[in-house]
């Protein structure tokens, strides 16, 4: 999808860019049967406490039900439309199956309207088809990857992301994947993945241009802890500009902020990571 640039008619327009939706999208009307209401929570939980900061005030939107499991085996589907989804960075494709059912999937790069797709172990290695990792040859780029068989995809769902199959272990139980971040990890060979790279890869190149566009998306400002009140942040308080008053910078919850690993070392999936993204960049 191409980028669209604007003339500097105002300070907000200067350097602003956006995606040219007319170049790739085929409709602006979503499938009504696959829409649900998406309530606004502004980052609050059921007690009204903020659990996710910097959220609130976004435009009204409806949620598109996406098929992350891709479990409709041995039934051919045809790509009817490529659509915009306000809930994610990737575009989505409406698939109409020969039995009459319709489903949304993530739209991979180079997926075309009218193209046939399928799911299951017997599917061909073509863009948009979903297969168990055990059936996909080495060197193939995949996305929409499951972590547990049948649980639905959890990895590689954002625009422009991919993973490449590097090999298999001795027993054939695990498949080794290289992620775009540089991480190498094992995933069960019975987990499913979709062939291809997630489309809309220019999404990361968009220049927001002005604060109002982020507010429209529901992203509120992020400010320094030193300009907050002491009840909001350990760095807050004082008359005017003040040092943080601590030996080292802290998070809003009082934990050390610099050089501290945040991943739980007892997390079960740690043993499946062969090489972390940080080790790859060294």
UniProtKB/Swiss-Prot annotation:
Positions of region (Disordered): 215-282
Record flagged with keyword rRNA-binding: yes
PROSITE patterns hit by this protein: RIBOSOMAL_L2 (PS00467)
SUPFAM superfamilies reported in the protein's UniProt record: Nucleic acid-binding proteins, Translation proteins SH3-like domain
Ranges of biased composition (kind: Basic residues): 263-282
NCBIfam families per the UniProt record, alphabetical: rplB_bact
Assembly, per entry: Part of the 50S ribosomal subunit. Forms a bridge to the 30S subunit in the 70S ribosome.
Name of the protein this chain belongs to: Large ribosomal subunit protein uL2
Gene label: rplB
């Amino acid at each position: 999808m191409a980028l669209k640039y604007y003339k500097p008619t105002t300070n907000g327009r200067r350097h602003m860019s956006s995606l040219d939706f007319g170049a790739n999208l085929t409709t602006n009307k979503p499938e009504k049967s696959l829409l649900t209401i998406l309530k606004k929570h502004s980052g609050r939980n059921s007690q009204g406490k903020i659990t996710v900061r910097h959220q609130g005030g976004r435009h009204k939107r409806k949620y598109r039900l996406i098929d992350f499991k891709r479990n409709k085996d041995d039934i051919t589907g045809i790509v009817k439309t490529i659509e915009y989804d306000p809930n994610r960075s990737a575009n989505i494709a409406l698939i109409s199956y020969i039995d009459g059912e319709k489903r949304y999937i993530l739209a991979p790069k180079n997926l075309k309207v009218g193209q046939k797709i399928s799911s299951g172990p017997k599917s061909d290695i073509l863009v948009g088809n979903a297969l168990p990792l055990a059936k996909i040859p080495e060197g193939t780029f995949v996305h929409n990857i499951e972590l547990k068989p049948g649980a639905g995809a959890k990895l590689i769902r954002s625009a422009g992301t991919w993973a490449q199959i590097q090999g298999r272990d001795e027993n054939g139980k695990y498949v080794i994947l290289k992620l775009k971040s540089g991480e190498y990890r094992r995933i069960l060979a019975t987990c499913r993945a979709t062939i291809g790279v997630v489309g809309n890869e220019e999404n990361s190149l968009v220049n927001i241009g002005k604060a109002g566009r982020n507010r429209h998306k529901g992203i509120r400002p992020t400010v320094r802890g030193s300009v907050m009140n002491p009840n909001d942040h350990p760095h807050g308080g004082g008359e005017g500009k003040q040092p943080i008053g601590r030996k080292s910078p802290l998070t809003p919850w009082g934990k050390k902020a610099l050089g501290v690993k945040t991943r739980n070392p007892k997390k079960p999936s740690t043993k499946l990571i062969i090489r972390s993204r940080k080790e790859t960049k060294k």
